[in-house]
Amino acid sequence: MALLTAQGVKKVFQFQKPEGREHLRRLLNWEEFDELRDSRRSILLDTLYESIIFAVGKGFPWREVAQVVKFTEELLKETKGCSITEAVTILGNKLRDYQGQFNTTHLLALCDYFHNTFIRHYKLYQYVLGQDQDVNLTVTNLEVCTPPQPLPLAEGKDREVWKHEQQLEELSTAEVQKRTNMLLLKGALRLEQQHLLQETFSQLPGRRHQTLNREELEKLITEAIHIQIECLKELLQYEIQITFDILDLKLQKKTLNLNAPIPPLVPIAGQPGQDEALKLSKTHKGKKAKAKK
């Protein structure tokens, strides 16, 4: 792919989407193409453009935004024709290869983005981008029918009850997302720790096959312990924050359940004894009116 610059992706973002996509196409040195006839290239361009929007929205520096586009295009090429298991492995390896390009927060955001888009809809990406499509277009005149009659109100759900259920579902989804982010961070920190330890060991000046003296060994052990403590401290801080966030979500759910709206009681026509009670009430009122006269 063409080498994208920070200034180039910045201009892409500043344009409206149609102009931004067109500017990105020129930066990639792609020839002009028919959006309707070449849907594969159109979708690929959309995917690369959306990666820019994602990276800018997450606060990536412009230099890293260009790297995100490069990462996206490489991932799409390398996973072509692969199974989803192989694709997950390739994604993990690429994230490891790009550790030097992004900090831990941005690397975690990138991992989360591709898990929620590319991996979640992997079969669709493979179907659209991974194989040639035989276009067999058939035009058929169809009659447009009016919508069916709505269901009786008795079968509906009270608006406040529906809103309450939606709020509970949103809180549950947020809790699951918090736990998922925690798992992703653990993986990212583990990779960062391995990388830092490898750097520390590689700095030994040609002593890999020689015995270290006591001072060198103590220094090496101290540095390794320091790296592990720093990674563990960052992990604990994040775990504490996540735990408080999850407890807050649980408290909100508990409060919502305590204040749950009571659905209105809708009388059902034809209920046993209801018609008879109504008749007795009318008869009783008629007798009172006659007595007053």
Swiss-Prot record:
InterPro entries xrefs:
CLAMP
Protein known as: Uncharacterized protein C8orf74 homolog
